[in-house]
Amino acid sequence: MSNPNIDPNTDWVLVGDIGGTNARFALADIRPARPILYAEQSLPTSDYASLQHAAETYLAQHAFKPKRAAIAVAAAVTGDAVQLTNRAWSFSQIELQTALGLESLTILNDFGAVAYAVPALDDSEREYLYGPQRALQSPVTVLGPGTGLGMAILLQDSAQQWSVQETEGGHVSFAPLSEEEQLIARWLNARFGRTSNERLLCGAGLSHIDAALAGAEHPSLHAGSETLREPSKIVQLALDGHDISARRTLARFCAVLGSVAGDAALIHGARTLMIAGGIVPRFIPFLKSSGFRERFLSKGRFVAYLENVAVYVITHPNPGLLGASVCLRAESNAIT
């Protein structure tokens, strides 16, 4: 059934943001400076065998056949073959383009897409945390925990044009800075063989931190048992204030995030830091009162440098979709 709200005279494009948990889609009008998203929808990745299946389901629901698409994926995009990091989906870009009947298909990293969205955000779509309140300054570090830990760099050239450098910075090795973090690292090393920052700074990472700390505090109760609490439950209990262990877990999560964010800002030479992902926007007041700021600045001789980095949390509900449409608009303008 056709959708009466979709203007057939508009050159709608398909945009997607595919993570380990959700496959988000929308139709986008990329003619305006800030593209317009329509018919946004989130599908659980666990319900679909492949990205193609999920995309076909979405398009069938809206009786729409686009000519162009830009799809952001939680994966390293280095060639035709793409394998999602936290979901058993793999595909060929060429084959997906053919299967969906597209004239062109752009595949980009999910946090690369979030970075593309940053210059298009309104003030109401980002919340200020710390540092100078000024116009957006390059370089911009974009990072955030969701199903995984994404990271990208946004750069502005002398002609005031923005470009994005995709990275896999979330997979850098974790550097514990306290006895408690060393305990967590040992717990993770025993189970995964190597501990990256993503093992702590993602949804599952909250559960990992929680289990490691609980096991250390009550070893007899947790011997031989590793029932993990759901990340959403941990956050809820921490914010309610009645569960000391949940608050301890979330506080440690925020502290580690501060360390990783500070390291990334130094490596990228950042003047701005944007925190995104599906987790942090749920507890911004908690983050502000946590050890995040102290750990972000705790870089020895470079405290003053980091004090001059503006730090924000992105609150736009679907920055990956917006960014994918911005990316496709930039590509279209470059061609014309």
Locations of regions flagged by a protein language model:
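Active-site nucleophile and cofactor-binding loops and adjacent substrate-binding regions
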Residues: 43-45, 86-87, 106-113, 132-135, ...
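Short amphipathic alpha-helical segments
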Residues: 27-28, 56, 82-84, 119-120, ...
